């Protein structure tokens, strides 16, 4: 379980998060919802240790390895889809995961040859390949059609059986996957 107690974070004197309290279970899908500019991405950055809170404490995340997909897919442009996933796994695992996310036959494509939804799936495959102690997905269903959303949703559900999956989404299907959630406002 990860506990955020009285978390506050400001940028340039403007509070983005103010006295936020959240308990994230050790498994299952946890949702972070809210309008744009409400601190969802900041909360993710705090959870993974990319930033420190101005106040409060985060309990239970010390030493955790987070596997993260941010809003921007952050694929390496000089590497193929297979190369991007193989950075964190062996080639056989990378091929299997690309197959699982519906990209069989696209392994040798470079990021600039992929659609937005395909890039998103490469990023998700890479995050799954990395493993980590928890999976954090910022808008995992962006650019995906309904059938692919359900397919990716099943993969997320399987992963969440043993580890926490934290998703930030505006997508109604994505929201339906969560067992617990918080709305930032």
Identify the residue ranges that each predicted region occupies.
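Conserved ABC ATPase "signature" region
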Residues: 92-106
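The feature captures the beta-strand-to-loop junction immediately N-terminal to the Walker
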Residues: 33-35
